[in-house]
Regions:
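Histidine-centered active-site/metal-ligand motif
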Residues: 14, 45, 78, 82, ...
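Glycine-rich His-Gly loop
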Residues: 14-16, 21, 82-83, 110, ...
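C-terminal catalytic-base region of ester-bond hydrolases, centering on the histidine
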Residues: 161-248
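Hydrophobic/aromatic beta-strand patches that form the interior of the parallel beta-sheet core
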Residues: 11, 48, 106, 168-170, ...
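Serine-dependent carboxylesterase/thioesterase catalytic core
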Residues: 59-159, 198
Length: 248
């Protein structure tokens, strides 16, 4: 299936690289989205794959996202952010004077209302696991703190949508039997606290904007990883891009 061609450049904003390294051996910034950039370019799209700190606060990553976009184009863009990349984009648009540069923002599997995994990570029990691992490896712990549910509530209150930007979102509901082990454990934990989820982000947390689409995909499937024959990422990405095409 071919990708629809958009009139404006497409910017891809990645999520936590440290997380993806844990899920996918050898994951690097340039292949976070795997075959998606090439697929988009084959249809004639101008594609900008941004590079921001793999583990960093929303504010820090948003600054780098802005720099990456302005260094690549002077045209308005369609932004697509996966996971934390969607939060970086929202911060950038609202707080860094980038609303005039962005035609639309589509977030995929983005924890707009935080994550119970982040809450657990800074709890007494979690500090012996995830949070301690981040601290001992000298990574930016603010990234994890930003995603706590109470901190995201404050973020949402201080980061309103901008009126001239179209906001869309994609949520995911993954099949735990098809998930890799890490996502399977997280899926069970999140399901207990927030219900349906993609193995890292609940559908309730991922909903944002004027139109919400649900994919039968886990957090990795959404960017073309471990799809097998149970999720056709090209078909779903094509539908998403067709919506942007019609709203331009």
């Amino acid at each position: 299936m071919n990708a629809p061609k958009l009139a404006d450049p497409i910017v891809l904003a990645h999520g936590m690289l440290g997380l993806m390294q844990g899920l996918v051996s050898g994951a690097r910034m340039e292949n976070y989205f795997r075959g998606i950039p090439d697929w988009l370019r084959k249809a004639g799209n101008e594609v900008i794959v941004t590079h921001v700190p793999g583990i960093g606060s929303i504010a820090r990553r948003a600054e780098m996202l802005k720099q990456g976009i302005l260094a690549s184009t002077n045209r308005t863009v369609h932004l697509i952010g996966h996971s934390q990349g969607g939060l970086d984009a929202r911060h950038m648009i609202t707080h860094l004077d980038m609303a005039e540069c962005v035609r639309s923002l589509t977030t995929i599997g983005t924890p707009h209302r935080g994550s119970p995994i982040a809450d657990w990570g800074v709890s007494t029990a979690g500090k012996a696991g995830i949070f301690q691992l981040i601290e001992t490896t000298s990574l930016d712990t603010q990234a994890f703190l930003d995603l706590r549910t109470e901190n995201m509530a404050a973020f949402n209150e201080s980061t309103p949508d901008m009126k001239d930007v179209r906001y869309y979102s994609v949520t995911g509901v993954g099949n735990p039997k098809k998930m890799i082990a890490t996502l399977r454990w997280c899926h069970k934990y999140i399901e207990k606290h927030e219900g349906a989820n993609d193995g890292l982000v609940s559908t309730a947390s991922a909903e944002w904007g004027e139109e919400v689409t649900e994919w039968p995909a886990d957090h990795a499937n959404q960017i073309g990883l471990f799809c097998g024959d149970h999720f056709d990422w090209k078909s779903h990405w094509a539908d998403m891009l067709s919506r942007l095409q019609s709203s331009s």
